[in-house]
A protein has these predicted regions:
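Core catalytic alpha/beta fold that binds nucleotide/phospho-ligands
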Residues: 1-207
Length: 207
């Protein structure tokens, strides 16, 4: 899995006509974020495919998972308060990104959303160790749901992360996929793909 850093641009000429229309329908601050994120995505993908940003067949309306045209691979997008992550693969892929120091009610999340096996493994932990372990599993679960093109509301309770954190299984669909965690600066990220070979082929772009 290869990783690169790229900063968002500001030149709206790199956007598609459809993206310009979508941006015009958003509040000003959200429109700026939308334009910059789509320009950045196009820049990352153009660099990967060796084409211009305008040639990238990207469909990424506000609030919806981004898609590439058939034959261009699969992508997944995640963002937190101060960073964005884009993943590309020849096979379906999902990513999730969070600040490594994010504070949240770890005990409550485990009790409400995690499987019985996960609760048994985690609820004896306390403090910072519990927070880190829950964050890692939450990242993998969200990445897996994006890989699935599912939803948190419908699928979160079905995804169980392995003790080694190297795979996740959907209990309702009887599907098992590969996962990988990484640290990058102030952030923690997870990638979910069909199998371990797809992990090797995956490309990441962080901004």
């Amino acid at each position: 899995m290869k990783e690169s850093r790229s900063e968002p641009g500001d030149d709206p000429s790199g956007l598609s006509a459809e993206e310009m229309v979508w941006a015009e329908g958003l509040p000003q601050r959200r429109a700026v974020q939308f334009r910059r994120s789509r320009l950045w995505m196009r820049s990352c993908l153009a660099s990967l495919h060796g084409c211009s940003t305008e040639e990238v067949p990207l469909t990424a309306p506000p609030g919806a998972p981004p898609l590439l045209a058939p034959g261009w691979g699969y992508i997944s997008l995640s963002h937190c308060v101060d960073a964005c992550l884009l993943a590309w693969s020849l096979q379906p892929v999902g990513v999730d990104l969070e600040r490594a120091d994010r504070v949240f009610p770890a005990d409550a999340l485990v009790r409400r959303f995690f499987t019985g096996a996960e609760r048994s493994a985690l609820l004896d932990l306390q403090g910072e160790r519990l927070r880190r372990e829950v964050l890692d599993r939450w990242l993998i679960k969200e990445a897996a749901i994006k890989w699935q093109r599912g939803s948190l509301a419908s699928d979160l309770r079905f995804w169980e992360v392995s003790p080694c954190l190297g795979w996740a299984r959907h209990g309702g669909l009887a599907v098992e996929i590969a996962s990988e965690l990484r640290s990058q600066g102030d952030w923690r990220l997870a990638v979910a793909v069909t199998d371990n070979q797809s992990l090797q082929d995956c490309r990441l772009c962080l901004a």
